[in-house]
Amino acid sequence: VLLVAPVARGSGGSYVALNLAAAFAFDETRQVILVDCNLRQPCLHQRLDVEVRNGGLVDYLEGRVDNLADVLYPSGLARLTLLPVGTRREASGDLLGHARMRGMIDSLRSVAEKVTVILDAPAANASPDTRILATMTDCCVLVAGYGRDTPAAVQSASAVLDPQRLAGVVFNRVP
């Protein structure tokens, strides 16, 4: 399970998460599940042109949907499945930190050896959600906007993550 988190809003975290998911999906032996965990500003369903009919992550976590498979949507790319946010929610920390979220990630992790789960998180410096989600993942990648996010902002964002899980920083929008 890989967490992708932008340093700040607009750094391109969702863009990098989506492109990483697509790259992993090119491996014909692997399935990829991309989870939109940005509950306040979800965008992956729009970028993949997925019509969210049955709800999504929030609906599953709040118990309105019992079967996770009901809120997993084909992305249009082979081997890439999207779990969209579904119903928007402003107060998200309690929901993402709930035991049902951890259980969901554990069940996705155990589905098969060749499943990669990528969590698209909100900005690390704008929400406690990233810190909460990072405790459930195997590794984390920060996305810094090149020429936009200062070294101090990158350092501040990386401080919310466990250094043992921080795989590195991706610089986005390099000229």
Regions found by a protein language model. Give the residues of each.
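Residue-level signature of catalytic and energy-coupling elements of molecular machines
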Residues: V4, N38, Y60, L83, ...
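Acidic-aromatic/histidine active-site loop/patch
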Residues: V1, E62, R173
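Amphipathic alpha-helical interaction surfaces in cytosolic regulatory modules
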Residues: A17-A22, T135, C139
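A short, flexible beta-alpha/helix-coil linker loop
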Residues: R9, Q41, T87-E90
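Glycine-rich phosphate-binding P-loop
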Residues: L3-N19, A25
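Phosphate-binding loop that captures ATP/GTP phosphates
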Residues: L20-V85, G147
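Conserved catalytic-core segment of NTP-binding enzymes
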Residues: D94-P175
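Residue-level preference for the first positions of well-ordered beta-strands
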Residues: V1-L3, Q31-I33, L80, T116-I118
